[in-house]
């Protein structure tokens, strides 16, 4: 696989001297959908803001397509066309009078023709299911709809990587599932995606791999099974097993009903495991 985004010994200190990132080594391969898992304040958002140069590191480097990111205006513009970031709060990203104008902002600043800008913008809105809202003011939309428009704004720039900070934050369960299914579908169409989250129940449903971050350090990388069978990592990161995993852990420890190495983490896996006991 091709490495599309990488950080090497990335360090970032806040102006007051606080260490936010402590030597992060991170790789994202083309076509992956991975989750950066950690509690609030672990450094997820700060790391994400380095991926396309919104923040410049104190030391270390960011590489996009094998090239070290530079921080002049031309280099940053090129980086942001390759790596698009969707902020946790869509209101931080939506500012234009209409949905269409908002989604068109990125491609307009790429020097494209008016026709190409509109085509890209409408295609992006269609992909996220928001084309009927093109002329609506963004502030009239629901939280889930705003998230979709923010995603469309990134899609319209046709990046290689989409970075989403807590994409399900503030959404009800149906809204959260809908957004995650959209991201899953985009990934299957070829978009490389990384999300930050502390929602351990959603992660096994959609992620290829997990990076666990604690106090500005990535303490473990691996598959969902590798992460959630490592009790030390779960405890250190102040996380928990998904609810499905907790049920099977209880069956194992209290009733000696075992299901092989590790516990099922999704309803589908649980169904398959239970069938073996019937």
From Swiss-Prot:
Cross-referenced CDD domains: ABC_cobalt_CbiO_domain1
Gene Ontology molecular function, alphabetical: ATP binding; ATP hydrolysis activity; ATPase-coupled transmembrane transporter activity
Residue positions binding ATP: 38-45
The EC number(s) this enzyme carries: 7.-.-.-
Domain of life: Archaea
Keyword field contains ATP-binding: yes
Disulfide bridges in this chain: none
Localization annotation: Cell membrane
Gene3D superfamilies named among the record's database cross-references: P-loop containing nucleotide triphosphate hydrolases
Keyword Translocase: yes
Main location per the UniProt record: membrane
Domain ABC transporter: start-end pairs: 5-240
Gene Ontology process terms (BP): cobalt ion transport
Membrane topology: Peripheral membrane protein
GO cellular component assignments: ATP-binding cassette (ABC) transporter complex
Keywords in alphabetical order: ATP-binding, Cell membrane, Membrane, Nucleotide-binding, Translocase, Transport
Xref: PANTHER family: ENERGY-COUPLING FACTOR TRANSPORTER ATP-BINDING PROTEIN ECFA1, HEAVY METAL TRANSPORTER
Family: Belongs to the ABC transporter superfamily. Energy-coupling factor EcfA family.
Function in brief: ATP-binding (A) component of a common energy-coupling factor (ECF) ABC-transporter complex. Unlike classic ABC transporters this ECF transporter provides the energy necessary to transport a number of different substrates.
Subunit architecture: Forms a stable energy-coupling factor (ECF) transporter complex composed of 2 membrane-embedded substrate-binding proteins (S component), 2 ATP-binding proteins (A component) and 2 transmembrane proteins (T component).
NCBIfam families reported in the protein's UniProt record: cbiO (TIGR01166)
Protein name according to UniProt: Energy-coupling factor transporter ATP-binding protein EcfA
Species this chain originates from: Methanosphaera stadtmanae (strain ATCC 43021 / DSM 3091 / JCM 11832 / MCB-3)
């Amino acid at each position: 696989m091709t490495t599309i985004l990488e950080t090497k010994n990335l360090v970032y200190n806040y102006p007051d001297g606080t260490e936010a990132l402590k030597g992060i080594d991170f790789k994202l391969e083309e076509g992956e959908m991975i989750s950066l898992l950690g509690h609030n304040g672990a450094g997820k958002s700060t790391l994400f803001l380095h991926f396309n140069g919104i923040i410049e590191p104190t030391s270390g480097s960011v590489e996009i397509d094998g090239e070290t990111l530079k921080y002049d205006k031309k280099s940053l513009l090129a980086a942001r066309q390759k790596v698009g970031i969707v902020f946790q709060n869509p209101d931080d990203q939506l500012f234009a009078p209409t949905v269409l104008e908002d989604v068109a902002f990125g491609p307009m600043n790429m020097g494209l023709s008016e026709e190409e800008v509109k085509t890209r913008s409408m295609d992006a809105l269609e992909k996220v299911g928001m084309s009927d809202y093109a002329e609506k003011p963004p502030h009239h939309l629901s939280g889930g709809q705003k998230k979709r428009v923010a995603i469309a704004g990134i899609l319209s720039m046709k990046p290689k990587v989409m970075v989403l900070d807590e994409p399900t934050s503030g959404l009800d369960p149906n809204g959260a599932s809908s957004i995650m299914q959209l991201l899953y579908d985009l990934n299957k169409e070829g978009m490389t995606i990384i999300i930050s989250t502390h929602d351990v129940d959603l992660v096994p449903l959609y992620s290829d791999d997990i990076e666990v971050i604690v106090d500005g350090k990535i303490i473990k990388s691996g598959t969902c099974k590798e992460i959630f069978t490592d009790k030390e990592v779960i405890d250190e990161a102040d996380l928990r097993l998904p609810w499905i995993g907790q049920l099977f852990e209880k069956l194992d420890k209290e009733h000696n009903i075992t299901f092989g190495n590790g516990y099922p983490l999704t309803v589908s896996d649980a169904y398959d495991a239970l069938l073996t006991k019937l």
